[in-house]
């Protein structure tokens, strides 16, 4: 008996069409010392399990650390003016990084959430959008000191109807990618040959 075909995901049309040029890559974002400090902090104990990017009941779950900002949909009773302060209390090395980014690459952006995801071997995400608001952005940082192509774990971006790939971004160490939250994207599975947790650090922002 043949398995039922998978349904192609369809997403609401955004306010503007997107292309690969909307996904901006910044390499060598931090000094080696600051990169190591961020990675060591993220790789320390304190992970919780159960995060997911696809709301389906059988969606893959993975590890996460929430540092500051909104946890769900932005309607929580949290003082947005305190996000950067809260980040400094919860994750000093990450707050130091945010201070650098907010005065350079992300000048004019306001922090709405900061968290980290951890994917072990065999784990993967689900195709999703972070927001449908044009002024909302997602920034993904890859903090590892090294990564091998055989480890996989690329971040893949799709067209709005999910029918084709816009871009596939390699998790190159010390790389930051910035993109509109409305672009559908997914963290691809981690190879069984990967001996470490694939860690990504996210800054959600608005302009």
Residue spans of the language-model regions?
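Non-heme Fe(II)/2-oxoglutarate
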Residues: 2-107
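Catalytic core of non-heme Fe(II) oxygenases with the double-stranded beta-helix
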Residues: 95-207
């Amino acid at each position: 008996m043949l398995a039922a075909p998978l349904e192609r995901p369809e997403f609401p049309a955004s306010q503007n069409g997107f292309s690969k040029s909307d996904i901006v890559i910044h390499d060598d974002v931090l000094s080696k010392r600051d990169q190591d400090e961020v990675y060591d902090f993220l790789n320390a104990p304190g992970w919780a399990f159960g995060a997911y990017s696809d709301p389906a009941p059988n969606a893959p779950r993975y590890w996460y650390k929430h540092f500051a900002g909104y946890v769900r949909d932005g309607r929580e009773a949290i003082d947005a003016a305190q996000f950067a302060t809260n980040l400094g209390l919860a994750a000093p090395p990450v707050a130091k990084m945010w201070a650098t980014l907010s005065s350079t690459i992300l000048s004019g952006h306001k922090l709405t959430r900061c968290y980290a995801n951890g994917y072990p071997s065999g784990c993967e995400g689900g195709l999703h959008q972070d927001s449908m608001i044009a002024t909302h952005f997602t920034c993904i940082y890859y903090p590892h000191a090294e990564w091998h192509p055989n480890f996989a774990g690329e971040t893949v971006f799709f067209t709005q109807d999910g029918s084709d790939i816009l871009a596939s971004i390699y998790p190159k160490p010390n790389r930051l990618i910035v993109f509109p939250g409305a672009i559908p994207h997914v963290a691809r599975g981690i190879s069984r040959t990967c001996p470490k947790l694939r860690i990504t650090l996210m800054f959600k922002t608005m302009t």
